[in-house]
Amino acid sequence: ALAKNAEVGMCRTVAAGLKPGSDVANLSVMGYDPAVCYTGRSPLEAASIGVDLKPTDVALRCNTVTLSGEESYEDKTMVDYCAGDISTEEAHQIIETVEKELGNDIYKFYGGVSYRHCLVVDNGTTDLGNMTPPHDISGRVIGEYLSKSENAAPLIDLMKRSYEILKNHPVNIERRKKGLHEANSIWLWGEGRRPQLENFKEKNGVSGCVVSAVDLLKGIGICAGMETPEVEGATGYIDTNFEGKTQAGIDAFKRGTDLVYLHFEAPDECGHRGEAQNKVKAIEMIDSRVLTKMLDYLNGCGDDYRILIMPDHP
């Protein structure tokens, strides 16, 4: 019924010359020009986990990944970019060990959610060559995707050293016993400096709220001065708390918020994993467990409204 009575069309969320990704695309959807304000993915995620970046700091996304067991690091294969969707509790134990063994006055590691974490480099550079996103090379030998830039060499060394530190970590020993993918290496990418986003309300004349499970979206919201409520059970995957996130959006409207940016990562995550059936299922659950509830509220609240449904990057 919604599609039947709606205006349907296409739009470009990633401008020519920019790498397609959730960071650039969501900034565009929110009305920001990434060509002007985008400084990298990880600084936005860092804001979400409470990392206060100095102007000279460079932040990088630090994935916990599963690599195969070849002796040479370059010969290993990217088995799993998310280490079997590792739990946040397990991942924090991994990152705590990495920080203890590899952290110092220059490198500081911070735990995020599930496999998504952060490295901050003091007085760092963003001129690192091609720091390949791990989800782009699933099933491939990693050697040709390691940056050959001289500036990136210390970071590649951290990745190599992390494998030796983590291959027999207690968390991984237990995951091995259970037949689960191990978080046996870190993978660094998404470098950038602290962003400067114009306040969303000052820019648009309306207040905003971002409801999302992932640090990237929450970080954009924080940097833009928007509300970013925490939702219990929000995982960023197909098992997320669809109803809880929808209710958080409704609660924001009840508090007087003008615009709610309700974001669901599940279809994108299923796509990265090659799970076509789960991607369809995720979209169907957004339809049945999110839109139905939200439209019931909007139709009964007595206010005029507009609703936009779209992917961030097709």
Where are these regions (language model features)?
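Conserved mixed alpha/beta catalytic, RNA-binding, or beta-rich assembly cores of soluble enzyme
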Residues: 15, 70-92, 114, 136-149, ...
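Active-site nucleophile/metal-coordination loop of metallo-enzymes that catalyze phosphate/sulfate
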Residues: 1-104
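Metal-dependent active-site segment of extracytoplasmic phospho-/sulfohydrolases and closely related
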Residues: 282-314
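Short, hydrophobic/amphipathic alpha-helical packing segments
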Residues: 91-95, 155-166, 242-250, 283-295
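Active-site His/acidic residue clusters
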Residues: 69-77, 121-141, 224, 246-295
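Anion-binding catalytic surfaces of enzymes that hydrolyze or transfer phosphate/sulfate esters
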Residues: 193-282
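Glycine-rich, mobile lid/loop segments that gate access to catalytic sites or pores
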Residues: 81-187, 191-193
